[in-house]
From Swiss-Prot:
Binds 2 magnesium ions per subunit. They probably participate in the reaction catalyzed by the enzyme. May bind an additional third magnesium ion after substrate binding. InterPro entries: 5-3_exonuclease_C_sf, Flap_endonuc, Flap_endonuc_arc, HhH2, PIN-like_dom_sf, XPG-I_dom, XPG/Rad2, XPG_CS. Its cofactor is Mg(2+). Mg(2+) 1 binds at D28, D82, E154, E156. Structure-specific nuclease with 5'-flap endonuclease and 5'-3' exonuclease activities involved in DNA replication and repair. During DNA replication, cleaves the 5'-overhanging flap structure that is generated by displacement synthesis when DNA polymerase encounters the 5'-end of a downstream Okazaki fragment. Binds the unpaired 3'-DNA end and kinks the DNA to facilitate 5' cleavage specificity. Cleaves one nucleotide into the double-stranded DNA from the junction in flap DNA, leaving a nick for ligation. Also involved in the base excision repair (BER) pathway. Mg(2+) 2 binds at D176, D178, D226. PANTHER family: FLAP ENDONUCLEASE 1 (PTHR11081:SF9), FLAP ENDONUCLEASE FAMILY MEMBER (PTHR11081). This is Flap endonuclease 1. Interacts with PCNA. PCNA stimulates the nuclease activity without altering cleavage specificity.
Length: 327
């Protein structure tokens, strides 16, 4: 999920949706979906949206509730899916698994104690994106004719690359600050929140701190990334000062007598990640509302009332824009 401390360095400002109308946004699908999945579960409980065979489908409710935000503001989302995870993330994944297991134990305790509020909070934290969640969400997006891209590796890296190199893509969409290290020129954050999004500007960040892209990545590595734990005593300010004094990661490490395992590889994962140009984006989407609704409510047994408003909003936005891409 990246290092949230990087916010202290990032050039970020709130941006009205009116300024974004007509834009194409390459969305980190994992990041976006997980936010809606956990929010749905926290407010309703995972058991509320479970099929007769025990399959959890809260993701479908979350997706239907979250998509109208794009459509109502004239944005075309392109959801970019992870194709694989680098081996350097193994430790991070193991840590998350252990943390989830701790939450599951605490969840059992909260349920036994009858603490509904604490149980709801912990239930949300135990969620993970299962293969079924991925498959059902993708099929829903297909029915709604929403563009999707399969990344060869990290979806966020692919989204950043598309924003940087493809004139058809205007913004990346992710709450993960790694988009900054990955060189996304402009990233929209808080797309799952109720207000206007935040715009994170890559060039403005570099200019504000007199950094090169490589040096920004070095600052991130010193603070810690999904691929390394960081160096003790280094936060954004101290890392920035150290890079300013010594020039790059290697000279800082030499001066501090420190070492970052796989440092070269980690640097390359941000500067030259595994990405592809083998994708097609068609912004002229034609959502099949009835088919999508039937998929969610009939095939996956979601209560029709839970998604009625979401589908109504998508349908209304498609009709109101008067643009070819929504008709």
């Amino acid at each position: 999920m990246g290092n949230a401390d990087l916010r202290q360095l990032a050039a970020i400002e709130e941006t009205p949706f009116a300024d974004l109308e007509g834009s194409v946004v390459a969305v980190d699908a994992h990041n976006w979906l997980y936010k809606y999945l956990t929010t749905t579960v926290q407010w309703t409980g995972a058991d509320v949206y479970t099929t007769s065979d025990g399959t959890e489908v809260a993701n479908l409710v979350g997706a239907v509730q979250g998509l109208p935000k794009f459509f109502e503001h004239g944005l075309t989302p392109v959801f970019v899916w992870d194709g694989g995870v680098t081996e350097l993330k193994d430790d991070e994944i193991a840590d998350r698994r252990e943390q989830r297991e701790r939450y599951e134990e605490q969840l059992d305790d909260a349920r036994e104690a009858g603490d509904a509020a604490e149980a709801a909070r912990l239930d949300a934290r135990t969620q993970r994106l299962t293969p079924t969640i991925h498959e059902t969400t993708r099929e829903l997006f297909d029915l709604l004719d929403i563009p999707q891209v399969e990344a060869p590796a990290e979806g966020e890296a692919q989204a950043a690359y598309m924003t940087r190199t493809d004139d058809a893509v205007d913004y990346a969409g992710s709450d993960d600050y790694d988009c900054l290290l990955l060189g996304s020129p402009v990233t929209l954050r808080q797309l799952t929140s109720s207000g206007h999004p935040e715009l994170m500007d890559f060039d403005a960040t570099l200019a504000e701190h007199d950094l090169t892209w490589e040096q920004l990545v070095d600052v991130g590595i010193l603070c810690g990334t999904d691929f390394n734990p960081g160096i003790d005593g280094f936060g954004p300010t101290t890392a920035l000062d150290a890079i300013g004094e010594h020039g790059d990661l290697w000279d800082v490490l030499a001066a501090e007598g420190e070492h970052v395992a796989h440092g070269d590889r980690i640097r390359e994962l941000f500067l030259n990640p595994d990405v592809t140009d083998d994708y097609v984006i068609d912004p002229d989407v034609s959502p099949a509302i009835d088919a999508a609704r039937a998929f969610v409510t009939d095939e996956w047994e979601v209560d029709a009332d839970a998604v009625a408003r979401g589908f109504e909003r998508i349908d209304a936005a498609a009709a109101q824009t008067g643009l070819d891409r929504w008709t």
